[in-house]
Regions:
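Short, acidic loop-to-helix structural element flanking the phosphoryl-transfer center
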Residues: 22-51, 57, 61
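Asp-based, Mg2+/Mn2+-dependent phosphohydrolase catalytic module
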Residues: 40-43, 56-165
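N-terminal-biased segments
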Residues: 1, 49, 64-66
């Protein structure tokens, strides 16, 4: 069995980048349609917003550019920036530190089981958006909702007291 070396790693990375170029991610199909509305709502309420994703920064930036969402986020963090990604809480701990907020001031919106576990381990409140397309286990979330619009309604009713920094 051949040892994994730098040359092989570089070759695989090059192949992966070529594949991604030839098969772009269908961001329009994956992004929840109510994302722009809730981001605008949060901006008007002067809520600090961050994006902490396990995806590569390349993929994150591509999605943000395609949907013109860059201006909403004070902090954007990629899982590539950490030795371990979700469910390890480091991505959320680092993001909260960069935003200058504590776990008790933070609401994490997640859809994945590992993301929910990471948010919980970071000490933050975690709400899950039910996404029936992928069948994620979301039972550990503090609250499950069916859309970002539902989250906006809940935040309006609570006057954002629990997440406003």
């Amino acid at each position: 069995q051949e040892a994994f070396d730098e040359e092989k790693a570089s070759e695989l990375q090059e192949g992966y980048e070529q594949f991604k170029e030839n098969h772009p991610m269908p961001y329009a199909e994956l992004l929840f349609s109510d994302v722009p509305d809730i981001l605008e709502f949060l901006r008007q309420k002067e809520v600090k917003i961050a994006l902490a994703s396990s995806s590569s920064m390349f993929d994150i930036k591509q999605m943000l550019d395609i949907h013109q969402l860059n201006s909403y986020f004070e902090v954007v963090v990629s899982g590539n920036d950490f030795k371990q990604t979700k469910p390890n809480p480091e991505i959320y701990q680092s993001t909260m530190k960069k935003l200058g907020v504590t776990p008790s001031e933070t609401l994490i919106i997640e859809d994945s089981e590992k993301g929910i576990q990471a948010g919980e381990a970071a000490g933050a409140t975690v709400w899950a958006i039910e996404d029936k397309r992928f069948g994620m286990n979301q039972e550990k979330a503090d609250l499950k909702v069916d859309s970002l619009t539902a989250i906006q309604k809940l935040l309006t009713e609570s006057s954002l007291k629990m997440i406003k920094a």
